[in-house]
Amino acid sequence: MKPWAAFHLIFLVASSVEGDVSNYGTGGTQDTEPTCCTEHQCISDKIILQGQPGIPGIPGVPGINGSEGLKGDPGPQGLPGETGFDGIPGVAGPKGDKGDQGDKGDKGDKGDKGDACILDDCPPTDVEVRNCQDLLEHGEILNGWYTIYPTKENPMVVFCDMETDGGGWLVFQRRQDGSVDFYLDWESYKKGFGKQESEFWLGNDKIHLLTSSGTQQLRIDLEDFEGSRTFAKYSSFSIGDENEKYRLIVGSYLDGSMNDSFRIHNGHSFSTKDRDNDTNKGNCAMMYKGAWWYFHCHHANLNGLYYKGKHANYADGINWRSGKGYYYSYKYADMKIRPQQSETTVS
C-alpha cells in the first residue's frame, strides 16, 4: 500500500472515532472516558497519529575540503633493496700524467747467434766495418748493399763489388740502362740520388767522408753496346767538402785496358747546371748535359746523357775521349774506391 493511502485510511478512522466520542458527550446513554489504541496518543481532544518513515532524501552537496594538516614524523628506515644491474660504462676520462720511469730490470740471458747480415737493415756491431774491404775480410763475398760505419756517428748504406779485381770495392757511381736522370742540380749531387737496383750517385758529401781518411784507390769500368769491357785504375782519389766545391784530387794512372782520360780533371771543382764552377766562359754542365769536375770542358763525361752507342750531339753522352771518343755513349759505367793495397791484382 502506498504511504499516502495508509495515511488517508487512518485519517478516516480517526474522524469516525472523533464523531463517536462527541456523541458520548452530548446526548448518549453512557458518559465514559475516551480509550486510545496502542499506536495512538490522546492529547486533550486531539489524536496524533505516528506515520511510517519517509523515503531518504537526496545526498547534500559535498562540503569544502579542510586545510592541509601538519607533516607527520618520518617513518622507520626500510630494508635495503636488491642490487640493480650494472650501468653502461661512462666516457673515458682524460689521459693521466706520465708516470715515473721504472727501475732497470735484470739482465736477460744471452740470445742465440743470429744469421749473417748483409743488407741495409743491419744493426751496428762490435766489429769495425768502415768500408767494403773490411766486410770482405770478415767473410762477406757477395755483391750487394751493405751497412758500413766510416765513423760511429755516420752509418752508411753502400753497394760493394766483391768480385772485380779481388773485391772490396765501394761503388759510388753506376750507369747501366738510362732509368735515372743524371742531369740534375747541385743539391741532388750533394745528397745523392738514384735506385739501388739500377743507377745511382752516392752523394758528394758521402764521397768526401769516405775519401777524407786514408788513401783510396779509384777504378773506372766501362762496357760498350758490343759487350767489350775496359777499365782504368788510379793510385788515389778524394774530393773536398762543399766549401771547397768538392774539388777533385786524383793520383797517378796505374794501369788499365783503356788509356787515361780522367787525370786532366785533377784539381778542378764540381759543377752542375745550376752551379758553374768550371774555367770555361760558359757553363760546361749545361752545354754537355751532365755534372762533373769540368775545366774547359772535359775528356770524360760519365754523368752525361744516356745514349745507346753512337750519337749525333757532340760530347754530351757517357763519353771517354781516349776510348770511343765524343760521339759514342757507353752502355755501362761505374766508379768505385777501395783502400790502397800494397799489392794489386789486375782483371
From Swiss-Prot:
Keyword Signal: yes
Chief subcellular location: secreted
Highest rank taxon of the organism: Eukaryota
Disulfide cysteine pairs (residue numbers): 132-160, 284-297
PROSITE patterns: FIBRINOGEN_C_1, FIBRINOGEN_C_2
Ranges for domain Fibrinogen C-terminal: 121-341
Organism name: Cerberus rynchops (Dog-faced water snake)
The protein's name in its UniProt record: Ryncolin-3
CDD domains membership: FReD (cd00087)
Protein keywords: Complement system impairing toxin, Disulfide bond, Hemostasis impairing toxin, Hydroxylation, Secreted, Signal, Toxin
